[in-house]
Amino acid sequence: MGCDAIRTSHNMPAPELVELCDEMGFMMMIEPFDEWDIAKCENGYHRYFNEWAERDMVNMLHNYRNNPCVVMWSIGNEVPTQCSPVGYKVAKFLQDICHREDPT
């Protein structure tokens, strides 16, 4: 493949992929969702963000925090909210969850 790291994007990865990365020595960055509370598309995660974001982040962190291949958590990629006046508050909210659940 010519790489040593894998970024999963927009959804939690299959456990089998994480186990394979552990076995093969790949590093992983895991990301739980592709948008926050501002829509990228009409039927996106923004519809559920306020209710589910913390639970989904905690679930991701608890599921994969002990896998040696996981070297980084992503709180989002190219999310429209980051450019809004409250974007930094949402980013801080998600960052705080990561630090609370995985203080390493």
What would you call each of these model-derived segments?
Residues 1-104:
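Active-site mouth of glycoside hydrolases
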